[in-house]
């Protein structure tokens, strides 16, 4: 989606759908970081990547890709702590 203007709800939903499809493809090909592994991601998920980059503002694409990695790292850290006996605080 070109431009820096505010996205309408339908445009945001289209972006989110494209993001989810791209991330689903990355998951199927065991690719976590779409930025670091850009070449591999482009080969495995070219149609989904193109749709994601077309339907979302560039800053959103970068944000979503970085957030995906951060979220994974956070989940891995939680699993490690739980394996060491850490308890969740309420």
From Swiss-Prot:
Biological process terms in GO annotation: mitochondrial cytochrome c oxidase assembly
Cellular component per GO, a single term: mitochondrial intermembrane space
Domain CHCH residues, every copy: 12-64
Keyword tRNA processing assigned: no
This protein's UniProt keywords: Cytoplasm, Disulfide bond, Mitochondrion, Nucleus
Disulfide bond entries: 15-56, 25-45
Span of the annotated motif Cx10C motif: 45-56
Motif, Cx9C motif: chain positions: 15-25
Localization per record: Cytoplasm; Nucleus; Mitochondrion intermembrane space
Domain of life, per lineage: Eukaryota
Keyword rRNA-binding: no
Family, as annotated: Belongs to the cytochrome c oxidase subunit 6B family.
PANTHER family found in the cross-reference section: CYTOCHROME C OXIDASE ASSEMBLY FACTOR 6 (PTHR47677:SF1)
Function: Involved in cytochrome c oxidase complex assembly and is required for efficient formation of respiratory supercomplexes comprised of complexes III and IV.
Designated name of the protein: Cytochrome c oxidase subunit 6B-like protein new16
Lineage: Eukaryota, Fungi, Dikarya, Ascomycota, Taphrinomycotina
């Amino acid at each position: 989606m070109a431009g820096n203007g505010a996205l309408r709800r339908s445009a945001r939903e289209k972006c989110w759908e494209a993001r989810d499809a791209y991330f689903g493809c990355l998951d199927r090909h065991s690719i976590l970081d779409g930025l670091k592994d850009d070449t591999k991601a482009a080969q495995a998920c070219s149609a989904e990547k193109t749709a994601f980059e077309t339907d979302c503002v560039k800053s959103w694409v970068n944000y979503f890709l970085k957030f995906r990695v951060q979220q994974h790292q956070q989940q891995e850290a939680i699993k490690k702590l739980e394996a060491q006996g850490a308890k969740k605080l309420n």
